[in-house]
Curated annotation (Swiss-Prot):
GO terms for biological process: malate metabolic process; tricarboxylic acid cycle. This is Malate dehydrogenase. Belongs to the LDH/MDH superfamily. MDH type 2 family. Catalyzes the reversible oxidation of malate to oxaloacetate.
Length: 329
């Protein structure tokens, strides 16, 4: 018997990442090749944005995806989020010229407060929320704090792009396929401060750290390359990474819903105090997923270099949180 359709909301649906994301969701890449979906697409209530969204929906129709059971366009989160199973919060205020980081934080705080409140009222209480729009960890924190009736654990931020970037850098360094690498971790904020950590990683069952055996490469090449990869893409392409971000969002939700078969992945999730990260901070941690739930990998040894990096990215998150505290009622 055919499965009942799942409802997926995507915000910023006519944007660059949205355009790379929607066709893959409708093709079954997000929730499985046997799972029909209904897309509930949110854009700002601006005539140009709504018109662009109508054009994207025309293209989605023209693909005649067997799994696309329906789609609707919205300018209000209260209708866009009605009865949804999954929310991909992609739309965020980009940083404009001359804009201070604190201005960016407060502009996004307004967006994510409104969206969190709407999720709280109209979404399913089991909704799985992924924030892609930057600053992703703090935006996820704002949405979580604005939705007290939805479990905090349902709010996540996207660290999977950093995770995938780190995987490919290691695969290139070792001249091996990415699929052979397991147990990579990316700690912290989705920003250049995040800490990709391959101390536990294996390739074909052998230690990646022992295979590379180069602390200087780790510190001076690997970590900065992963941290600055987004900027390098803007420099090369003139536009920010959209297809790779959409791909990471698909990976994140796909694994959360359908499981990782014991493989470690990185998700930005609310801390419960693990690894001395204060409770409620949405921080990149290693997890495995099964039966629609993620479970943190606990008890990993944190050496001095790692603790320093983990604290550095934590401090940035705490600073961002402090910058929006007054905006959260």
């Amino acid at each position: 018997m055919a499965k009942a359709p799942m409802r997926v909301a995507v915000t910023g649906a006519a944007g660059q990442i949205g355009y790379s994301l929607l066709f893959r969701i409708a093709n079954g890449d997000l929730l499985g090749k046997d799972q029909p979906v209904i897309l509930q697409l949110l854009e700002i209530p601006d005539e140009k944005a709504q018109k662009a969204l109508a054009g994207v929906m025309m293209e989605l129709e023209d693909c005649a995806f067997p799994l696309l059971a329906g789609m609707t366009a919205h300018s209000d989160p209260m209708t866009a989020f009605k009865d949804i199973d999954v929310a991909l919060l992609v739309g965020a205020r980009p940083r404009g010229p001359g804009m201070e980081r604190k201005d960016l934080l407060s502009a996004n705080a307004q967006i994510f407060t409104a969206q969190g409140k709407a999720l709280n009222v109209v979404a399913k209480k089991t909704v799985k929320v992924l924030v892609v729009g930057n600053p992703a960890n703090t935006n996820a924190y704002i949405a979580m704090k604005s939705a007290p009736d939805i479990p905090a654990k349902n709010f996540t931020a996207m660290l999977r792009l950093d995770h995938n970037r780190a995987l490919s850098q290691l695969a290139n360094k070792l001249n091996k396929p990415v699929a052979d690498i397991e147990k990579l971790v990316v700690w912290g904020n989705h920003s250049p401060t995040m800490y990709p950590d391959y101390r536990f990683a294996t390739i074909d069952g052998k230690s990646v750290k022992d295979s590379i055996n180069d602390a200087a490469w780790n510190k001076d090449v690997f970590i900065p390359t992963v941290g600055k990869r987004g900027a390098a893409i803007i420099e090369a392409r003139g536009l920010s990474s959209a297809a790779s971000a959409a791909n990471a969002a698909i990976d994140h939700i796909h694994d959360w819903v359908l499981g990782t078969n014991g493989k470690w992945v990185t998700m930005g999730i609310p801390s419960k105090g693990e690894y001395d990260i204060p409770a409620e901070v949405i921080y990149g941690f290693p997890v495995v997923c099964e039966n629609g739930e993620y479970k943190m990998i606990e008890g990993l040894e944190i050496d001095e270099f790692s603790r320093e990096r983990m604290t550095h990215t934590l401090n940035e998150l705490l600073e961002e949180q402090a910058g929006v505290k007054h905006l959260l009622s």
